[in-house]
A protein has these predicted regions:
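Redox cofactor-anchoring modules in respiratory/redox and cofactor-processing assemblies
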Residues: 1-123
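Cys/His-rich microdomains that often coordinate metals
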Residues: 48, 138, 145
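Ferredoxin-like iron-sulfur electron-transfer modules
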Residues: 29-35, 76, 113-133, 144-166
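The C-terminal cap of the DNA-recognition helix in HTH/winged-HTH DNA-binding domains
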Residues: 80, 142-143
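Short cysteine clusters
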Residues: 38-44, 84, 131-137, 141, ...
Length: 166
């Protein structure tokens, strides 16, 4: 209802708690802008694609510092050259993210997300001190991504695990 009353590109300030990942929220925000893009303005159309993909890479642990530099350069150009508010809004958001949340970006570049929101950056393991070696974890894993059994500490297969937390 709020998105219909107050479109996301109108300057309304959104607040987030410390438990929400600002990088993930930025990726979702740019995704919404990308979906609304009419495609007429080259800088908006192509810039939204590049920034959205860059933020997706960042939340997936695939981005490099050079990607962040490229997104900043692109955002600077988008702010000047976009003919509509969508491109200018995305540019402002990206520049603001880099200016005010640089630590969050660095954290994601290092493969961590302190909110545990970005699943690709969360790594599960079975604590040997807590494991009783009774196979309980093996039975409870819906993806059968845990190898173990009686008198063995379970080991999680990162490729099979969908990070459900069960």
């Amino acid at each position: 209802v709020l998105d219909e009353t107050f479109p996301i590109e109108n300057g309304v300030i959104e607040t987030y708690s410390d438990e929400e990942c600002i990088v993930k929220k930025a990726e979702e925000f740019v995704g919404k802008l990308r979906a609304k893009c009419c495609g007429k303005c080259v800088f908006c159309r192509e810039g939204l694609v590049q920034i959205h993909e860059g933020l997706k890479d960042l939340t997936a642990g695939k981005a490099k510092i050079t990607d962040i530099d490229l997104m900043k350069e692109l955002a600077d150009i988008m702010r000047q050259q976009s003919n509509c508010s969508l491109g200018q809004t995305a540019a402002g958001m990206m520049l603001g993210l880099q200016e005010y949340f640089a630590d969050d970006i660095k954290e994601h570049l290092a493969g961590r997300c302190h909110t545990l929101t970005c699943k690709a950056l969360v790594h599960y393991y079975i604590d040997p001190k807590m494991c009783k070696g009774d196979g309980h974890c093996v039975e409870n894993c819906p993806k059968k991504a845990i190898d173990g059994g009686k008198d063995f500490v379970g080991v999680i297969d990162e490729f099979e695990c969908d990070k459900c937390g069960k």
